[in-house]
Amino acid sequence: MNNMHSQTTIAAIATPPGRGGVGVIRLSGPKAYDIAQKLTQKNLPEARMAGFRKFYDADGSIMDEGIVLCFPNPHSFTGEDVVELQGHGGPVIQNALLGRLFELGAIAAKAGEFSMRAFENGKMDLVQAEAIADLIDATSQAAARSAVRSLQGAFSTKINTVLEKLIYLRLHVEAAIDFPEEEIDFLADGKILALLEDVQQSVHAVQTSARQGQLLREGLQVVIAGKPNAGKSSLLNALAGVERAIVTDIAGTTRDVLHEKISLNGLPITLTDTAGLRETGDIVEKEGIRRAIKEIEQADLLLLVYDLNQGDDPLKLAQEYFSEHIEPRRLMLIGNKCDLTGQSAEISDYQGFRHITVSAKQEMGVQGLVDAITAHAGFHPEEDTFIARTRHLDAMKRTQLYLAEAREQLVVFNAGELVAESLRLAQNALGEITGDFSADDLLGKIFGSFCIGK
């Protein structure tokens, strides 16, 4: 698509805030070259050729010096004239240069506006634009590789292939409607049903891959909870591979919620260690317990850690602590300190719940726990896994619902017009993923989550 509203020239700092050897400011828009030339008081270098320039203030004094790179439209990131100014990376000088660009006619870029313009000018689709942010925010190598695949168009290609099938199906249905004398033959000969079922299977295949991509992007929220001194902090340290939490023999040592971002078998995990759940008069510890309950309610997976030496029934503990939150999909029972009881580290079933015996301090059974966590999440990415977001899965879910409606209208009622309407809605839902069909408020929400300089 070609964007006609970008008559303004935007500017923003493109490097992370703070001190650094190099700081980059990006300009994009019809006046980018004119503004950069006024800043440098010299002709700009040739396209894609680095040129050393001084940067001047309004009174002619030198503010900084550095490299200037020019990218003429339409062969630039945004599809507009783009200039990158590479100066020194201190926040004071970077903000001063940015202020000078505003004086010369640029305006401040909104969050994600550079990527928004690239999308609107047809330089990338919506999935690829999102992949830029996902690559920057990747918390594991596997997530980064998947984001690169999405950026290169792997996800978009799959969606576009399904869209082509869906459009082809719509053409056949529309033909049946346009030529009513042939309607019975078109709708009843089985060809349209076969095409419809093929589209459903194709969407399902993409959904399966997208769920893996969503796990890579969003990871899993895992909470370690249990009685004080059950070994929760030791287990966090064993999983994280670093001594992060305070580990002592004093009950109630962990008084706050500790977070650790790690990768288990390639799956990004936010591991949370909570305060021990118990009655206490200590004000600080009460606050820790309040936060622990909140984390437990929001967790994707809960590891209930208990001391095998105490003879506790883990399921009774879970029922006491978590009440309505306990279910096999969200809870694993972890019997800790098996080295002190002489038990072997193993995985078993305990009344329908996964039960794992470990020794966190001795790291016995820890790898088995890691494997159980990733298997529990259904995480098994392939080499061609692409990054995906919740909105992508939601769009595919709605697509499948509309396709199911279309199938019912075809098989049960033989109602061609209703089939056509359901297929139209399915195409619109699927088209939201790449941006072929997207409301303005959806675009604003997506790009508004980006960095300012992206």
From Swiss-Prot:
Requisite cofactors: K(+)
Subunit structure: Homodimer. Heterotetramer of two MnmE and two MnmG subunits.
Example GO BP: tRNA methylation
Family recorded in the similarity comment: Belongs to the TRAFAC class TrmE-Era-EngA-EngB-Septin-like GTPase superfamily. TrmE GTPase family.
GO molecular function, one term: GTPase activity
Residues binding (6S)-5-formyl-5,6,7,8-tetrahydrofolate, per UniProt: 26, 84, 123, 454
Any Pfam family: MMR_HSR1
Record's cofactor remark: Binds 1 potassium ion per subunit.
Organism annotation: Acinetobacter baumannii (strain ATCC 17978 / DSM 105126 / CIP 53.77 / LMG 1025 / NCDC KC755 / 5377)
Subcellular location: Cytoplasm
EC identifiers of the protein: 3.6.-.-
Annotated binding of K(+), by residue: 229, 248, 250, 253
Domain TrmE-type G: 219-378
Residues binding GTP: 229-234, 248-254, 273-276
GO cellular component entries: cytosol
Superkingdom of origin: Bacteria
Enzyme superclass (EC): hydrolase
General function of this protein: Exhibits a very high intrinsic GTPase hydrolysis rate. Involved in the addition of a carboxymethylaminomethyl (cmnm) group at the wobble position (U34) of certain tRNAs, forming tRNA-cmnm(5)s(2)U34.
Protein name per the record: tRNA modification GTPase MnmE
Binding site for Mg(2+): 233, 254
Keywords: Cytoplasm, GTP-binding, Hydrolase, Magnesium, Metal-binding, Nucleotide-binding, Potassium, tRNA processing
